[in-house]
Swiss-Prot record:
Belongs to the tubulin family. Keywords: Cytoplasm, Cytoskeleton, GTP-binding, Microtubule, Nucleotide-binding. GO terms for biological process: cytoplasmic microtubule organization; meiotic spindle organization; microtubule nucleation; mitotic cell cycle; mitotic sister chromatid segregation; mitotic spindle organization. GO terms for molecular function: GTP binding; microtubule nucleator activity. This is Tubulin gamma chain. Its main location: cytoplasm. GO terms for cellular component: centrosomal corona; centrosome; cytoplasm; gamma-tubulin ring complex; microtubule; nucleus; spindle. Tubulin is the major constituent of microtubules. The gamma chain is found at microtubule organizing centers (MTOC) such as the spindle poles or the centrosome, suggesting that it is involved in the minus-end nucleation of microtubule assembly. InterPro entries: Gamma_tubulin, Tub_FtsZ_C, Tubulin, Tubulin/FtsZ-like_C, Tubulin/FtsZ_2-layer-sand-dom, Tubulin/FtsZ_GTPase_sf, Tubulin_C, Tubulin_CS. It comes from Dictyostelium discoideum (Social amoeba). GTP binds at residues 142-148. It is found in: Cytoplasm, Cytoskeleton, Microtubule organizing center, Centrosome. PROSITE patterns: TUBULIN.
Length: 462
């Protein structure tokens, strides 16, 4: 029985990377732009039904909702060659189409006003699933719609589907001149901490660096970075779509990666990525080569000092025809060379999931790999966001845009900032051997001081 996953694409960024994701899945499953199987595609060798369903005319339709407050990106999808792929009833654009103006509070408020429209679509899609496992959300944490409306949807999803997995692919901002992105990021991260079971961190700075280095260009385009993101997304779901003996569902995949609920922010690495023909012609990919490269900082898609922190967990998804003996020998070599430093309080091991490559895509590499890792150095990314937030908050820059939407937003800022700082301390504590005791002591102190602390506050109501 399939464990279906519904994808929610929210905002400009969420729909752009979601669109690339579906193009990639169509290629890997032998599905054309209209949703029909190609003549060369063979039925029964994969599990398309995790992400697609078949309509009455037998064409494959993504289990996806396309949601935005302004029409530009969705209009481009509707006029592309893939326009016939999607269920038009699962596309929502706000009637006025003015967007959220890079304002989290505005996006949240509009999401609240469109609650019935959005969740009627979600409920219809969920009811059409035989055994729904969860939701996959693509969005940016720094804009207005992906952050604000995305936050609102996260909260309501958690309320309405408490037993379903929620995984997000969240794009973190680069160091741009958009001042308010720090406000939006802090408010969104609070919702990701509280409501997501797993968040795959997609750091714009690192994505641009990796694409630039591999393509040898100074200014990568948005399409090029989105293509990289779609590669990561498709690789991270390959064991669900081409199942083996392990990691056939999200629960199994996340169980070993996230030993403590709060530390659920995952970093990624992928190799080989080079499209330079000269490099491809001389490189010999092996399991050891792939696993070694996955641990190298230049291949990790987060701007964080991974050499100074510790791994809480690693799952390597290896694609290709691989002899299990090669896996064993590679793991032994990595241990001998001490290529990865693990926390002291958990199993110091790299989990391996073997997956088939799509038979419909030609590859010049025999072996490729994706690393999903829980690493304590991700706290540096959160610390940087806090530092940038504190600077603009001290100047009270553009705060009026937020207080205009809600008089309670300043209190919400303070709570969100405190929660993000707690997450930073949590990851730092995870580097220590007495982390379990630290966690117990913290809970004990919180219980004793409960009457003196701030009450939990949830922004907005249904």
């Amino acid at each position: 029985m399939p464990r279906e996953i519904i994808t929610l694409q929210v905002g400009q960024c969420g729909n752009q990377i979601g669109s690339e994701f579906w193009k990639q899945l169509c290629k890997e499953h032998g599905i054309n732009a209209a949703g029909y199987l190609e003549e060369f595609a063979k039925p029964g060798i994969d599990r398309k039904d995790v992400f697609f369903y078949q309509s009455d005319d037998d064409h494959y339709v993504p289990r996806a909702l396309l949601l935005d407050l302004e029409p530009r990106v969705i209009d481009s999808i509707k006029t592309s060659e893939y326009s016939g792929l999607y269920n038009q009833e699962n596309i929502f654009v706000a009637e006025k189409g003015t967007g959220a103006g890079n304002n989290w509070a505005n996006g949240y408020k509009q999401g609240e006003s469109f609650y019935d429209d959005i969740f009627d679509m979600i409920d219809r899609e969920a009811d059409g699933s035989e055994s729904l496992e969860g939701f996959l959300l693509t969005h940016s944490i720094s804009g207005g719609t992906g952050s604000g409306m995305g936050s609102y949807i996260l909260e309501r999803l958690n309320d309405r589907f408490p037993k379903k997995i929620i995984q997000t692919y969240s794009v973190f901002p680069d160091d741009s001149s958009v001042v308010v992105q720090q406000y939006n990021s802090v408010l969104t991260l609070k919702r990701l901490i509280e409501n997501a079971d797993s968040t795959v961190v997609l750091d714009n700075n690192a994505l641009h660096r990796i694409v630039g280095e591999n393509l040898r260009i100074d200014q990568p385009t948005m399409d090029q970075t989105n293509s990289l993101v779609s590669t990561v997304m498709s690789a991270s779901t390959t064991t669900l779509r081409y199942p083996g003996y392990m990691n056939n569902d999200l629960v199994g995949m996340l169980a070993s990666l996230i030993p403590t609920p709060k530390c659920h922010f995952l970093i990624t690495g992928y190799t080989p990525l080079s499209i330079d023909r000269q490099t491809e012609s001389v490189r010999k990919t092996s399991v050891l080569d792939v696993m070694r490269r996955l641990l190298q900082p230049q291949n990790i898609m987060v701007s964080a000092p991974t050499k100074t922190g510790k791994y809480i967990s690693i799952l390597n998804i290896i694609q290709g025809d691989v002899d299990p003996t090669q896996i064993h020998n590679s793991l032994q070599r990595i241990r001998e060379k001490r290529m990865a430093t693990f926390i002291d309080w958990g199993p110091a091991s790299i989990q391996i999931a073997l997956s088939k490559k799509s038979p419909y895509i030609k590859s010049s590499h025999k072996v490729s790999g994706l690393m999903l890792a829980n690493h304590t150095s991700v706290n540096h990314l959160f610390s940087h966001i806090i530092q940038q937030y504190d600077k603009v908050r001290k100047k009270q820059a553009f705060l009026a845009n937020y207080t205009r939407e809600s008089g309670e937003i300043l209190q919400e800022f303070d709570i969100a900032r405190e929660m993000l700082d707690d997450l930073v301390q949590e990851y730092k504590a995870a580097e220590q051997s007495d982390y379990i005791n630290y966690h117990m002591n913290k809970e004990f102190n919180n219980n004793n001081n409960n009457n003196n602390g701030n009450p939990q506050y949830q922004y907005g109501t249904v």
